[in-house]
Amino acid sequence: MPRTVGRSILALAALSISVAPASAQDARLAEQVDRWAELMNEQVIAWRRDIHANPELGMQEFRTAALVAEHLESLGIEVETGVGGTGVVGVLRGGRPGPVVALRADMDALPVTEQVDLPFASTATAMWQGREVGVMHACGHDNHVAILMGVASVLAEMRDDLPGTVKFLFQPAEEGPGGAEPMLADGAFEDPRPDAVFGLHAWPVPVGQILYRPGGQLAAADGLRIVVRGVQTHGSQPWSGVDPISAAAHIVVGLQTVVSRQIDLTDSPAVVTIGQIEGGNRGNIIPDSVVMVGTIRTLSPENRSRVHALIVQVAENIAESQGAVADVTIDLGYPVTANDPELTQQMAPSLRRVVGEGAIVMSPIMGAEDFSYFAEEVPGLFIMLGVTPPEDPSMGHPNHSPLFFADERALQIGVRALASLAVDYMSGRPISD
């Protein structure tokens, strides 16, 4: 995912800024969240370090899932394992009736060799695409799991006072092949069905910031493959064949006009990128075909459909104009991660209570996330948690980098944020502060 630049760096002292809850009952619950989050912080840090040192690729999160399940069971939470592969679902039923809230954390790591000098740095390896690779939590999922384990501890301590039910979703394979859909197909949203779902993601902006936006926050990501077919001939006689390389070059340029000239970028951004072109094996032979592979990113279902149609039209027409044929294949990936506008407005005061002015409405991100599938089922809110040391912005390396670093001071903020979202939603917190 590309880096998002936040607003000005906040002093850590600002983390104590709070907004008064809506009632005395809300105030008491908020105080309990903060107190238990502080008491649990050292344990959350220990979990995070353990998970970071023992990363596992998608659908191989056996150790992580076992750690999660054992912890949830120790809290007296109902636990189901093997959901959608290696997923874990926990259900905590509060002492008072109320809504059902789902909280989600993804568990998988990446095929990346860690370059961060930490005493708990990963030295793990695994087989990936037929070769041995290093494995690292280069996207912060170790933080996500530890935070949600901490939230489970906090809310379990508050069980008797909780006005509703909390469903904990520990999801496999967000980085691929995808774990949200298999979990849903395996009944993760059944018995009971959530009324809302919340999640967070570690992001390279300063600790003390939480970024969010109503509507499309992360893009849909679709695969693009175009095969341009021509007629092979000798390079000295191009007129006796059909050159697919020339056609492919024009298609690359033409695809950029889809975004720059045919889509209203002031309404909803879009990106079309060709990242791979293969064709021919000799410098003096015009090949019979060229293969182009790329990615399509859009931020609304309407633009997604429109961009797909325009890509097919542009590629086919340009190829035809040069006597070639273009076969276009679009593989649907994760849909848009869209925050429910009403839910976002309702819960914004909860975020401000945790980080004050550090709760920032952000610009969209053209990366993708399969939290989107959960948010298609019920209203959802996905937030970006700042994990870069405010005093050293140079540590803010992009997600998926072998240098990705997460400041552990963000963990307690993450626990407070997710727990507050759950408690405040169940309490029926009003829209205004």
Predicted regions and their residues:
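Histidine/acidic-residue-rich, glycine-tolerant segments that coordinate divalent metal ions
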Residues: 124-136, 142-143, 155-287, 394
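Acidic/His- and Gly-rich active-site-bordering loop/insert found
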Residues: 26-136, 143-163
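Metal-dependent amide/peptide-bond hydrolase catalytic core
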Residues: 25-28, 74, 249-433
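Soluble non-cytosolic domains of exported or imported proteins
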Residues: 38-42, 55-66, 142-146, 239-246, ...
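N-terminal secretory signal peptides that target proteins for export/translocation
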Residues: 1-5
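Divalent metal-coordination and catalytic microenvironments
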Residues: 51, 90, 103, 141, ...
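Hydrophobic beta-strand positions in extracellular immunoglobulin-like domains
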Residues: 92, 228-230, 296
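Bacterial N-terminal signal peptides
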Residues: 8-20
